[in-house]
Amino acid sequence: MKIFSESHKTVFVVDHCPYMAESCRQHVEFDMLVKNRTQGIIPLAPISKSLWTCSVESSMEYCRIMYDIFPFKKLVNFIVSDSGAHVLNSWTQEDQNLQELMAALAAVGPPNPRADPECCSILHGLVAAVETLCKITEYQHEARTLLMENAERVGNRGRIICITNAKSDSHVRMLEDCVQETIHEHNKLAANSDHLMQIQKCELVLIHTYPVGEDSLVSDRSKKELSPVLTSEVHSVRAGRHLATKLNILVQQHFDLASTTITNIPMKEEQHANTSANYDVELLHHKDAHVDFLKSGDSHLGGGSREGSFKETITLKWCTPRTNNIELHYCTGAYRISPVDVNSRPSSCLTNFLLNGRSVLLEQPRKSGSKVISHMLSSHGGEIFLHVLSSSRSILEDPPSISEGCGGRVTDYRITDFGEFMRENRLTPFLDPRYKIDGSLEVPLERAKDQLEKHTRYWPMIISQTTIFNMQAVVPLASVIVKESLTEEDVLNCQKTIYNLVDMERKNDPLPISTVGTRGKGPKRDEQYRIMWNELETLVRAHINNSEKHQRVLECLMACRSKPPEEEERKKRGRKREDKEDKSEKAVKDYEQEKSWQDSERLKGILERGKEELAEAEIIKDSPDSPEPPNKKPLVEMDETPQVEKSKGPVSLLSLWSNRINTANSRKHQEFAGRLNSVNNRAELYQHLKEENGMETTENGKASRQ
């Protein structure tokens, strides 16, 4: 059904009876020259507006805001009521502007206070308003033409705002009854006409205005449904600025508007051209411009609106960007704006600044952290728009890193399991209706939420936080325990899984326990199984209330966890034996380390003594009185000498390196020439002297002198 909301048609009915010429009694200072006044000049007396003037100004302000933000498809019809109804404009788009309305109101003029009040009534205007609502607008006619034979599907709704001076609450009820009867009669006429439409819904807003200082004879009343077609609400408001504030509040309610206050606007002072001051300007726009604030929950941005408005205003600061490239910020929405105080100097300066082709970036006020530019003011085609800039992460950027979250590195998360979890909880169209046990219709969305709640009752996000979800043996139980109801086969599979875990514990099979962040070998095998059983019990207990069969699974689990006394005794003996093995293993390791150190020290001493002997031999080998050299074996045969007894434990790194160096040096050493030519390992000395002097050597190889 093509529905036009109540905001599509708005009819203003303003009372033009003689009592509306009465003063509102709210004085306005006419003579503002309080300084440098010449003595002897009498100041002008303050003036006050009439109830009629206050009503016209407030209604015009209502229309101005509506036309600024909704130049199309939001229509206003203005009616003045005295001795008859005077319709000032029509539903055509050409008549929808302030100039036409103000020219028509000027032609009507103020009410005549000397006219006969008995001949004047607001009822004439209310009847004309109902008749006007039955007329078809251009947009409704276009929609009916497109639908052709289904033209009756186009809706017709509207709103009547009546500003009058009622006498009492009974007078207000009489006006409501008149409107209700008139709607009923005109709906009958419209049913038989091709040029009229029946009123499907009408909102009647009665505003009782009275002079300042008087007591109100009419009580306020919130919106009340008088019939399926008519709803009514009553507002009792003092004239003057109070009436203007009330109309400002109503226009925000009727058209879903929100308020934004621009703070810290730098402006030149008129008196001092070299100085500037900061001003604030409040703007009205559609509430969708604040959707991001509502989603993010930034409640601290709100503040009280001017004149005690019913809604809070969002405060944004004038921002001076470091770059002139506005295209760096991409826009997600643009909404027309309307200043609340359009005639004030700050509002005028801001609008002129924007209409000259300038743009203003707006940032969220923050006590700490970097600035967040969330909105921008700019004009297009002579109209000012509030642009919403995306202050969140762009979908084109890389996703944020989760390394700073609870899991640490990305690989620590159960990413594969989470993908399977999402696949099992996808939303799909649900065509066939389903019913609950009690016979009520089951809503697919609620059923999906309930399933998601069941699957997330116990679902660790990090691999190191779980044991059972890392075990393939637990999958048959974990996959079915989240169901709303279990079959006998499901219960049997769960019991088999539990018995399989008991068998694993009896065999002392290892478990996939994460040791990240722990020192040593981690928890003992008995402690690992205790952790596993506790986690499995937590999972089953999270779903125990689903059905009776879930209770049977828990009973089986608890029965298997309660071990017999001999089993506990065996576990204790096993733990004692493990402790003894750990102690003996530690003692053996300490002994082997000490033994290796002693062997390395002994080998080091042998090598040092060998170096000393070689040095002494070098010193005395050229001396004529040198004694007979001791019997020495060739160095090449050092490998044949008995090695230092190796320890039964592992050889130290020093021993391995020393042996390697000694072997390499022995192969590089040039052997002594006498040892190479010796007989029976004995070499004859000074043979060249014998050859020169003819001396003979003794038997033992020593030369004798003559």
Swiss-Prot record:
One Gene Ontology CC term in the entry: intracellular membrane-bounded organelle
Coiled coil: 567-622
A Pfam entry, by short name: Mat89Bb
InterPro entries the UniProt entry points to: Cell_cycle_regulator_Mat89Bb
Composition bias, Basic and acidic residues: 615-636
Placement of sequence motif Nuclear localization signal (NLS): 572-582
Residues that bear Phosphoserine: S623, S626, S678
GO terms under biological process: cell division; centrosome localization; flagellated sperm motility; mitotic spindle organization; protein localization to nuclear envelope; regulation of fertilization; regulation of mitotic cell cycle; regulation of transcription elongation by RNA polymerase II
Annotated segments matching region Cleavage module binding motif (CMBM): 649-694
UniProt region (Disordered), positions on chain: 564-603, 615-650
UniProt entry tagged with the keyword Cell cycle: yes
Cross-link Glycyl lysine isopeptide (Lys-Gly) (interchain with G-Cter in SUMO2) residue location(s): K611
Tissue specificity field: Widely expressed. Tends to be up-regulated in seminomas compared to normal testis.
Compartment(s) of residence: Nucleus; Cytoplasm
Ribonucleoprotein is among the record's keywords: no
Effect of S227P: In a colorectal cancer sample; somatic mutation
Family, as annotated: Belongs to the Integrator subunit 13 family.
Domain text: The cleavage module binding motif (CMBM) mediates recruitment of transcription factors.
Function: Component of the integrator complex, a multiprotein complex that terminates RNA polymerase II (Pol II) transcription in the promoter-proximal region of genes.
Protein name listed in UniProt: Integrator complex subunit 13
